[in-house]
Amino acid sequence: VAVRNIFPAPGLDPDHPREPPMQIQPMISTHPDVRGSVNDSLIRAIEAGYGCAAVCRICADACLAEEMVRDLTQCIRLDLDCADVCLATAGLAVRRAGSNEALIKRMLETCAEACADCAIEGEKHAEMHEHCRICAEECRRCEDACREAAASIRPSRH
């Protein structure tokens, strides 16, 4: 019995050549408090955060299925921590209109650190576990996006 890969690489599934883009940018740009002025680096960080959270959760689950699961305990913990931080950061950032920019900046910086920690751990297992390699790469992408977005935010003083 042939097993179909339900998680094909993006663009490689002939039935779904490309995933539709997230609708975050159009949604935020229509917000009455934003009026079309969108921080593109923040949008990239939001999308990267949601994507990284999913990849980290999948990696943690894949690690749990490995025979040597005890050797992957720290990797699993960091995957789950990273996923939670990414979700919290993205969730806060999508509500950025009228919110605390200083807090968003700190969350983005924290998310970048969580992603860096997770990537370092995943890279230790990357040669033996493909899911750890993929996760580490996704964490690095999210880390970069969060650092770029954090640098773009200049909180106003009240």
Model-flagged regions — what are they?
Residues 1-21:
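Short, Lys/Arg-enriched N-terminal segments with co-localized hydrophobic residues
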Residues 21-158:
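Amphipathic alpha-helical hairpins
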